[in-house]
Curated annotation (Swiss-Prot):
Lineage, uppermost ranks: Bacteria, Bacillati, Bacillota, Clostridia, Eubacteriales
Transmembrane helix is among the record's keywords: no
Residues reported in the UniProt entry to bind [4Fe-4S] cluster: C300, C360, C363
Enzyme kind, highest EC tier: lyase
Subunit structure: Heterodimer of LeuC and LeuD.
GO molecular function: 3-isopropylmalate dehydratase activity; 4 iron, 4 sulfur cluster binding; metal ion binding
Known pathway: Amino-acid biosynthesis; L-leucine biosynthesis; L-leucine from 3-methyl-2-oxobutanoate: step 2/4
Cofactor field: [4Fe-4S] cluster
Alphabetic keyword roster: 4Fe-4S, Amino-acid biosynthesis, Branched-chain amino acid biosynthesis, Iron, Iron-sulfur, Leucine biosynthesis, Lyase, Metal-binding
NCBIfam families hit by this protein: hacA_fam (TIGR01343), IPMI_arch (TIGR02086), LEU2 (TIGR02083), PRK00402.1 (NF001614)
Record-linked HAMAP family: LeuC_type2
Record's keyword annotation contains Secreted: no
Organism, as annotated: Heliobacterium modesticaldum (strain ATCC 51547 / Ice1)
CDD domains for the chain: IPMI
UniProt name for this protein: 3-isopropylmalate dehydratase large subunit
Length: 420
């Protein structure tokens, strides 16, 4: 019996010829990631254990992104813990104010994750890197601490679900719409502890930015990881950035899947997820009259240059509705600079939007766009749980950047074509 791409990567990192679903393995790691929220917990435990050195100062990545620049004393103290640890252990890849970015936008951009890697991160959206053909998954601070010290982690090999997306994507349908449609179909626990393998002609047509959006939200269906086999687009992207050698894996023709789910993408339209779960999806044409108070465009899901270009194309020459606050935050400093170079930031500001430094802030209800009681936000982020972006009696709706930009103009949730 053949193996899936995820099984092959895990087998290689466990030093085994093969693995099968349900098997417990100890795997060597290529990269261990943490941020200003999750790292301090691990650091305190490592200091209690008198850690002399991290397993590899080149393979531990610390990204200050959740509360950066620090919003209050507590967040400043957390950042200092990370900063001091990075200096003490001479961590090569520590990203702080000025050179930071949202971690899951930053690492691919820096070439720190490559095809065939095994990566853990103390952030649930670490699964983003599956778009590069890597096994990447989120862990808690205990497993993170072990990873920092030893460069290893244990896993139960997940079953796999194969998702086949066939047909040509309609003009207004994005990778965000594909993954929201999928989560709406299978539910937020539809892929619980399973590998979500995205395939098909529609995936082939997606840009790398679109693929990262899809893999980013695998966790929202309960997935252990999301993954897309590398192709020419992947290799072209990686070759420009890779900081080390890599190995490409693909699934065998006779690999075993728990399920195979097929979608005809030509029938799809832009999707909106209603409160309070990403599975509560509707085509935007069926959204009804939903007025909004705030629009957020950015995050590790949709803060890449393609997303900003899409939003700018719609906002150009128009104005954000008088009752809407529109906040746009590029995923990294490099993306921010590229957006300036292309004139996108001018378009956003002229339209009446606020542009933020790269941060996770509003996505987790941390800062830079908190919702008050009774307010509604439409966001290109990845979660819309109760109280996710502020008051527990606020509401969050999820969508792609084109729907977000159009709705910012209209003051209510609309199809992008309604504001052309």
């Amino acid at each position: 019996m053949g193996m899936t791409i995820t099984e092959k990567i895990l087998a290689a990192h466990a030093g085994k010829a093969s693995v099968e679903p349900g098997e417990l393995i100890q795997a060597k790691l290529d990269l261990v990631l943490a941020n200003d929220v999750t790292a301090p917990v691990s650091i305190k435990e490592l200091e209690k254990a008198s850690l002399d050195a991290v397993f590899d100062k080149e393979r531990v990545v610390l990204v200050q992104d959740h509360f950066v620049p620090a919003k209050d004393i507590k967040s400043a103290e957390q950042s200092k813990i990370v900063r001091d640890f990075a200096r003490k252990h001479d961590i090569t890849h520590h990203y702080d104010v000025g050179d930071m970015g949202i971690e899951h936008c930053l690492l691919p951009e820096k070439g720190l994750v490559v095809p065939g890697d095994a990566v853990i991160g103390a952030d649930s959206h670490t699964c983003t890197y599956g778009a590069l053909g890597a096994f990447a998954t989120g862990v808690g601070s205990t497993d993170l601490a072990a990873g920092i010290a030893l460069g290893e982690a244990w896993f139960k090999v997940p079953e796999a679900i194969k998702f086949e997306y066939e047909g040509k994507l309609p003009e207004d349908v994005t990778g965000k719409d594909l993954i929201l449609h999928t989560i709406g179909d299978i539910g937020v626990d539809g892929a619980l502890y399973q590998s979500m393998e995205f395939t098909g002609s529609a995936i082939d047509d997606l840009s790398m930015d679109g693929r990262m959006t899809m893999c980013n939200m695998a966790i929202e269906a309960g997935g252990k990881n999301g993954i897309i086999a590398p192709d020419k687009k992947t290799i072209a992207y990686v070759e420009e950035r890779a900081t080390r050698p890599y190995k490409v894996y693909t699934s065998d023709p006779d690999a075993k899947y728990a399920r195979v789910i097929k979608y005809d993408v030509e029938k799809l339209e832009p999707v909106v997820a209603f409160p309070h779960l990403p599975e509560n999806t509707r085509p935007v044409s069926e959204a009804g009259h939903v007025e909004i108070d705030q629009v957020v465009i950015g995050s590790c899901t949709n803060g890449r240059i393609e997303d900003l270009r899409m939003a700018a194309k719609i906002l150009q020459g128009k104005k954000v509705h008088k009752n809407v606050r529109c906040i746009i935050f590029p995923g990294t400093q490099a993306i921010y600079k590229q957006a300036i170079k292309e004139g996108l930031i001018d378009i956003f500001i002229d339209a009446g939007a606020a542009v933020s430094t790269p941060t996770c802030g509003p996505c987790l209800g941390g800062h830079m766009g908190i919702l008050a009681k009774g307010e509604r936000a439409l966001a290109t982020t990845n979660r819309n749980f109760v109280g996710r972006m502020g008051h527990p009696e606020s509401e969050v709706y999820l969508c792609g950047p084109n729907v977000a930009a159009a709705s910012a103009i209209a003051g209510r949730i609309v199809h992008p074509r309604e504001v052309e």
